[in-house]
């Protein structure tokens, strides 16, 4: 029994959508073949976009196409890294899964008996849940500081790209500082918009309490 960091296969439809999206930037990935071949093609994509203006957007869309990595005693490999067996610990930061790995390595290297699988699977589940809570808190704190920062720039114009499309409006990520805000649907005209389209916006509203940024499109 051992805690692994596992990462399942991505949904085939999401892979196809990702490949369609990155084609507009001149990239492509494999959407069929062995999991190792597909994984390596995605890693090549992430290498190819480094230091390019589209890096942040392509990385974000790529992550949305992937399953979330988690901890488990039931090993299925790590798709993103193309490893059949993968676990880890960090230094000097110590997360609880790091401590489990340390303790079990010490136990097994000393010839100790295996541990209860059910107990460690429960600990892995708890660690995965806490990791997600921490990630959500990090995103919320980053968003708070973005809104605070842009709140001092009301009325200013910035160039960006459409990073998301929902029934409520368009999300735009700014090229200069990677802040993201929304252009509400009520403020949009009849034009056609798609992910990755370049746009120019004006900072319209910044609600720090709700951590919301509203942009207005500037027609050029």
Locations of regions flagged by a protein language model:
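Structured C-terminal cores of nucleic-acid metabolism proteins
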Residues: 8, 13, 18, 23-220
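Glycine-rich phosphate/pyrophosphate-binding loops
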Residues: 1-5
